[in-house]
Swiss-Prot record:
GN (gene name): deoC
Keyword Lyase: yes
Broad enzyme group: lyase
Native organism taxonomy: Bacteria, Bacillati, Bacillota, Bacilli, Bacillales
Keywords for this protein: Cytoplasm, Lyase, Schiff base
Protein name: Deoxyribose-phosphate aldolase
Amino acid sequence: MEQNFARMIDHTLLKAEATKEQIEKLCAEAKQFNFASVCVNPTWVKHSSELLQGSDVLVCTVIGFPLGANTPAVKAFEVKDAIANGANEVDMVINIGALKDKNYDLVQADIAAVVQAAKGSALVKVIIESCLLTDEEKVKACELAVAAGADYVKTSTGFSTGGATAADIALMRKTVGPELGVKASGGVRSLEDMKSMVEAGATRIGASSGVAIMNGLIADSNY
């Protein structure tokens, strides 16, 4: 079971002040525990890719992060640049304001631009920033992600007012059905936290506390 859990974790370090030494430690830990991926900012993709060469650990990065307020063209360029640097997965933030405005065509086109840019090269996870949305908006965001051809929906950036909840994961899973992945991120700090997310329907976990989770310890990290 522990190995299965390890393969569900995106070992994450997205803090602005992350140093080269910290990224190298992240990658070493990911290799040690055989995590699914490391999730790093775009500036660290190339170095992480080099460090993880020959391992099963993928490189995941973030697009339009953390606000989601870039244009679709900029997000698409970010994806292509990330792939050129070695990214295997991209976690993009939706246009949250457009969703609130019920400008669903723009929200879907924005996701579709990223999906198109990643096609054949990288898996796409769509961050809906659930803490800022009503349940109705969460459902709509997930439906738009499905329509745009995304691979996953994801709760949170970890940089807003809240993180993943089991209730949100259950709602997202119910909305997207069994085919799409669902990623819980933000505030998953212990093995118990992770178990509750997986039981609710999560298939991937984004956490900076991956090592603590694997050791069954509660970390004092905020992400």
